[in-house]
């Protein structure tokens, strides 16, 4: 019976002092949670800012590529009919009436430009 009284008194004392320290513990827990939240927030923001930077770089590169028209449109090669009904000649070729094919098919052909 004496041991039960001793344990009950210890329980009451622990509860009383536990409540007194609980306010301090709650403040410490709030600080820890806030610090962890800040670290998590900063850790999440770092990849997001990196992602935003990469997207900005990618968009500028795509704009440059779109501005310079890096891909050539479909064109006709050498000795292929050209004109208003056909695709334009590729770079380095010109659409000219030729003696070889033009008189037979009655259309100009893509040929290497003459210097004369």
UniProtKB/Swiss-Prot annotation:
Protein name: U16-barytoxin-Tl1c
Domain notes: The presence of a 'disulfide through disulfide knot' structurally defines this protein as a knottin.
Positions annotated as propeptide: 21-76
Disulfide bonds: 75-90, 82-95, 89-110
Family to which the UniProt record says this protein belongs: Belongs to the neurotoxin 14 (magi-1) family. 06 (ICK-Trit) subfamily.
Compartments (UniProt record): Secreted
Keyword check for Secreted: yes
Phylogenetic classification of the source organism: Eukaryota, Metazoa, Ecdysozoa, Arthropoda, Chelicerata
InterPro entries listed in its UniProt record: Toxin_22 (IPR012627)
Molecular function GO terms recorded: sodium channel inhibitor activity; toxin activity
Extent of the signal sequence: 1-20
Organism expressing this protein natively: Trittame loki
Gene Ontology CC entries for this record: extracellular region
Tissue and organ expression note: Expressed by the venom gland.
Main location: secreted
Sorted UniProt keywords: Cleavage on pair of basic residues, Disulfide bond, Ion channel impairing toxin, Knottin, Secreted, Signal, Toxin
Function: Ion channel inhibitor.
A Pfam short name: Toxin_22
């Amino acid at each position: 019976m004496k041991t039960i009284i001793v344990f009950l008194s210890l329980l009451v004392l622990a509860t009383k002092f536990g409540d007194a320290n609980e306010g301090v513990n709650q403040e410490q827990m709030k600080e820890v949670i806030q610090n962890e939240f800040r670290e998590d927030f900063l850790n999440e923001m770092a990849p997001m800012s990196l992602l935003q930077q990469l997207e900005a770089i990618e968009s500028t590169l795509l704009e440059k590529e779109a501005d310079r028209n890096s891909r050539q449109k479909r064109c006709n090669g050498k000795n292929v009919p050209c004109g208003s009904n056909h695709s334009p000649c590729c770079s380095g070729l010109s659409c000219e009436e030729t003696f070889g094919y033009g008189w037979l098919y009655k259309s100009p052909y893509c040929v290497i430009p003459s210097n004369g």
